[in-house]
Amino acid sequence: MYAVVKTGGKQYKVAAGEKLKVEQIPADIGAEITLDQVLAVGAGDQIKFGTPLVSGASVKATVISQGRHDKVKIFKMRRRKHYQKRQGHRQNYTELRIEAINA
């Protein structure tokens, strides 16, 4: 069984037992969270789509870790104008382990 969930403005296809890195969720390590925004649920060749959400469906997950992605380097430059700008960015993430899908 799998589900498509929406969290942090993005959509993820998840199944029980998988690990997943999502946008940062303010929760302690080891805390159990519920993802309520389930867009689709599937098992085998049967799929149930929501309009926009599947009613009564939820995904239970456990927070494994909180961390930061690798640095992304941004470099802007205007030719012949002696303008250069360097910037870096590290996005925070939360790593989840999917425990169960309730449909």
UniProtKB/Swiss-Prot annotation:
Signal peptide: none annotated. One of its GO terms (cellular component) is cytoplasm. The keyword RNA-binding applies. GO terms for molecular function: rRNA binding; structural constituent of ribosome. Coiled coil: none annotated. Keywords: Ribonucleoprotein, Ribosomal protein, RNA-binding, rRNA-binding. The keyword Ribosomal protein applies. GO terms for biological process: translation. Pfam families: Ribosomal_L21p. Part of the 50S ribosomal subunit. Contacts protein L20. Belongs to the bacterial ribosomal protein bL21 family. HAMAP family: Ribosomal_bL21. This protein binds to 23S rRNA in the presence of protein L20. This is Large ribosomal subunit protein bL21. It comes from Cupriavidus pinatubonensis (strain JMP 134 / LMG 1197) (Cupriavidus necator (strain JMP 134)).
